[in-house]
Amino acid sequence: KAANKGASIHFMDIALREYHFPISDYIISDTLSLVENIGLVAKAASTIAQLDVPQHIQEQLDKLSEPNATHKQIAQSLFTKTNTLLLNGLVSRSHSDFSLIRSYINILASLTNSNLGELTSGANSVGAYITGCIPHRNLLGQSSQAGLNALEIASKNHDLMILYGLEIDDCLYDQILTKALKGSKKVVVFNSFMESVINDHADIVIPINTTYESKGSFINLTGQVQDFNQELLLPNHYYSNEALLTDLVNERDLDIPSFNDFIKELESFIDQSIANRNYIKEFPVKTSNSSPIDTTNTFNMYSIDAILRRSRPLQQTKESRTIT
């Protein structure tokens, strides 16, 4: 829609992909050169801006080669256009030098007064962060004592392991997680489909509805909260995931937080987050034993969740055979 309304669209990627809208510039880079190409756009922007750049940033940019005409053109468009947006995608997020890429993009956004956006591998990664469903955050992004991350959870045997809406094929650490399922004393799985690994190693399996039979909300790329309610299409007596979880919480006599109160706080939190830009202006520490990796984790767009993986028509499309 933005392109059709006259927006200038620029891409930097490791492959040429098919898009159905006008593209102003498209830089195709190998994996190792991707970091430098992003840095070169930032270097071109620093020259155009003619601002006093912090010394540590200028020294890092000076280590790069000279920007070419395309780098300069992309940088120039970020100054001449209004309401500019930089989107960081999945290729860079799975890159071994993602921290450096993120620093360059943040510096570029700061120099050009651009907004920043993140394309994540999950549809509701921001929601998980804001609701405290990650190891080092509580509700609304408040810091907390760090718990275990996904790899740490998968690398240990537990007295009790609970998987909710998660299939082994969803995990980067699938083999490690399978070992944890085998070694844990009690395994409880909430899922919409049965896998052989779950069938072999789960002690309790509780069926739940798919996303397409549920209600919920997510925060989109622009910071808007969007709601959906697929339960409206189902019979009144249909047992929802929400009712299931509520019953389990009530059995433990635990307090259930008010979702409506949370939404009110969330709106203010999002507004403040958008208004208060907090650009990263530091570079990651380079470790002496680090070595470049010339591959990135790639994804088949029709294999990212249980429903898509099981759709035979989608698996026969051209896109299902294209790694993105």
Regions found by a protein language model. Name each.
Residues K1-N276, T324:
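Non-catalytic alpha/beta scaffold blocks inside enzyme catalytic domains
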Residues I101, I263-T324:
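Long, low-complexity segments enriched in small/aliphatic residues
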